[in-house]
């Protein structure tokens, strides 16, 4: 499976990490079978970590072997951590994802119960309101703020001078969450930043981290517990906690518009912005719920489509560029998560100026400005049909000329 290479932060050792965890506590895993959760008796540790790329990781590791079995990249409002009150035989907690039915259960192994609520509160706090880069014991500024892009040689010049490859890099695996963050622009917004040469004095951005969340399958191997560890809870019925909406606090900072803006700066800025839950107009369409494996299967069976998609597969000695790999990549949880983020960003109505940089037709850009995903899809489909028709007509003309 190529998902690790498609999203480099999921590859072990590909990102540096801070030596100090934001929060950690001893807890075991629980496996969900049908409607019942069963405790895994191994000694474990749950911890939240912010890596050097500013992403927030929710992790579980085996304290005996030191093996990290679960490493989830979480962005704000993606999930909630809460106690399962229905379980009376132990201190059971669930990490409930708001999109879909994914749930991960854990049982507390801390000998004392006095800090259970504090651990739970901190987990939700760091998952839904991640600290800004440099906020934890660092003296650095967190990089350029968006307001600096409004000055001379700012965002409009930067985007206008980007090559297609650079733009793809901006919204690619490491910047895709940044693309979604465009929808959270406040103040003048992206459109006015592109059209205005006047610098602003401050900018507001949400302290969010974005990337697709992935779950590493856990092992079922058990190891002997020490006698000092709390007793594992009895098997309990699985419950579905109601999700609670968390708000993200903004952070403002004055910046100098005279600082040169690099592609990496813009990418980092976009990566710290939150994706809005819904667009301003109409009902939001989630592309991940539309482009399902069942719908994509006949399309991906087309040899011409496979040939066009092949160059975009992750490259590497151990990553075969095959039709099967296309199927694996497009149906991976990481890709589906990224697709949902793009849907939210497109529905925000802030992507029109960026879409125009790709040379998309005016109808598609207009739809992106309005946050109308359905109109955007229709415009792209119309353009594709026109190009196919023109290509076919050109081919027929060439054949007629060769016959003459």
Swiss-Prot record:
MF GO annotations: endopeptidase activator activity
Keywords in alphabetical order: Cytoplasm, Nucleus, Proteasome
Transmembrane segments annotated in the record for this chain: none
Biased composition (Low complexity): 195-247
GO BP: proteasome assembly
A cellular component annotation (GO) from this entry: proteasome complex
Pfam families registered for this protein in UniProt: Rpn13_ADRM1_Pru, RPN13_C
Electron transport as UniProt keyword: no
Domain Pru: from-to ranges: 17-130
Bias kind Basic and acidic residues: ranges: 386-395
Annotated region (Disordered), positions in chain: 195-258, 377-404
Subunit structure: Component of the 19S proteasome regulatory particle complex. The 26S proteasome consists of a 20S core particle (CP) and two 19S regulatory subunits (RP).
Family: Belongs to the ADRM1 family.
Protein's recorded name: Proteasomal ubiquitin receptor ADRM1
Organism (species): Xenopus tropicalis
């Amino acid at each position: 499976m190529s998902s690790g290479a498609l999203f480099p932060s999921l590859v072990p050792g590909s990102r540096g990490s801070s030596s100090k965890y934001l929060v950690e506590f001893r807890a075991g895993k629980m496996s969900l079978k049908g409607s019942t959760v069963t405790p895994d008796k191994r000694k474990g540790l749950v911890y939240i970590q912010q890596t050097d790329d500013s992403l927030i990781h929710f992790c579980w590791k085996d304290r005996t072997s030191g093996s990290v079995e679960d490493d989830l990249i979480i962005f704000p409002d993606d999930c909630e951590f809460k106690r399962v009150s229905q379980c009376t035989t132990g201190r059971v907690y669930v990490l409930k994802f708001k999109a879909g039915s994914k749930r991960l259960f854990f049982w507390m192994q801390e000998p004392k119960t006095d800090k259970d609520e504090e651990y739970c509160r901190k987990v939700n706090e760091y998952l839904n309101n991640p600290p800004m880069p440099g906020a934890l014991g660092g003296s650095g500024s967190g990089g350029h703020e968006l307001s600096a892009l409004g000055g001379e040689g700012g965002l409009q010049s930067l985007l206008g001078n980007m090559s297609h490859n650079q733009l793809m890099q901006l919204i690619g695996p490491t910047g895709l969450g940044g693309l979604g963050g465009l929808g959270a622009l406040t103040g003048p917004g992206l459109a006015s930043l592109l059209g205005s040469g006047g610098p602003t004095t401050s900018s507001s951005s949400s302290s969010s981290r974005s990337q697709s969340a992935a779950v590493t399958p856990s092992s079922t191997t058990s190891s002997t517990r020490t006698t000092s560890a709390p007793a594992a809870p009895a098997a309990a019925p699985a419950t579905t906690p109601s999700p609670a909406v968390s708000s993200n606090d903004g952070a403002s900072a004055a910046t100098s518009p005279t600082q040169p803006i690099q592609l990496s700066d813009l990418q980092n800025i976009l990566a710290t912005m939150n994706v809005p839950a819904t667009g301003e107009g109409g009902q939001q369409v989630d592309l991940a719920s539309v482009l399902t494996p069942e719908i994509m299967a006949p399309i991906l069976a087309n040899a011409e489509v496979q040939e066009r998609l092949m160059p975009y597969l992750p490259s590497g000695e151990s990553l075969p560029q095959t039709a099967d790999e296309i199927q694996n990549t497009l149906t991976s949880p990481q890709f589906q998560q990224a697709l949902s983020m793009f849907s939210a960003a497109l529905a925000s109505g802030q992507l029109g100026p960026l879409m125009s940089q790709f040379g998309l037709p005016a109808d598609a850009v207009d739809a992106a400005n309005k946050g109308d995903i359905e109109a955007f899809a229709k415009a792209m489909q119309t353009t594709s049909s026109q190009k196919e028709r023109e290509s076919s007509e050109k081919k027929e003309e060439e054949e007629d000329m060769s016959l003459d």
